[in-house]
Structure formats: structure tokens, C-alpha cells
Amino acid sequence: MYALYVFGDIIATILGTIPFLIIYLGSLVTGSLYTLYYHKKEPYYSAVGASGAVSGIIYSSILLFPDMQLLLFFAIPIPGYVFGVGYLLYSIYGMKKQLGNIGHAAHLGGAIGGFVLTLALKPELFFINKMMVLLLAVPIVLVLLFSDKLKSL
């Protein structure tokens, strides 16, 4: 919830309360839908939580401020866009390896929702920083293209 507090404040301040709620709830839905899709052949799979929504908020904040400095392991400063791409790549790896009791598919689906909804609410981002938008889109596009193959790798 700390991540929601920190990153949510960025979105609420820049875009406003209603856009924040749209991104949060939309990411919650996309995270849930992607999880259902990814685990469609696992009838006993269950998950609970709002991690997809929080992931959408994080990815939205990074899209708004890709050069923000984040601390990796509370000590190593890295740019937001590096964290964003790394976060999604780790989620893909976690989905493949089924790491821990974590909803990696929800994280990925929520990030996709946060990315798409932020661009829908603030389309000028694409024109202001086209290369960064494309860089942040790469892991999303890869997942959407190869999602069915992810489990069989």
C-alpha cells in the first residue's frame, strides 16, 4: 500500500482525482481479466488483492515521469523507466516460473491497463516523449504477442 500512496499521489496531483480513479479501477479490471485469461486452464487457481490496480498506478506514474529516480533495494538510484521495464520483465519471469504466491499475471495486466489508460487520458505524452512511450510499451507488446507461448517455454 506504500506504493499506492507514493505513486498514487503523483497521478492525483498531475491528472486529478477522477483520472486517478479511472486508472486505478481500470487497472484492477485489466489485471483481473488478464489473470483469468492466463490461468484459464487452471480451474482451481484463485487470487485476491489489488496488486493489478497498484501496478497500473506505478506504471502510469512512470509513464508520466520516466526519469524520476527510484531507489532499488532502498539504496541504488535508478530511473523510473528502467524500473518499469525491469518490473514487467520480472513479472513475465515470475509468471513463467510460478514464483511464490504472487499474482504476476495481475501485475502485468494492471500495468497494461495503467499504460493504456494514461495514454488515453493524456495522449500528448506520446508526442512529448515518443521514444520513452515506445520503450515502456516493448514488454507489453511482447507479452501480448507471446502470452500463449509463455506457459510452454
Placement of each model-derived feature along the sequence:
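A detector for small-residue-rich transmembrane helices and their helix-helix packing motifs
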Residues: 1-153
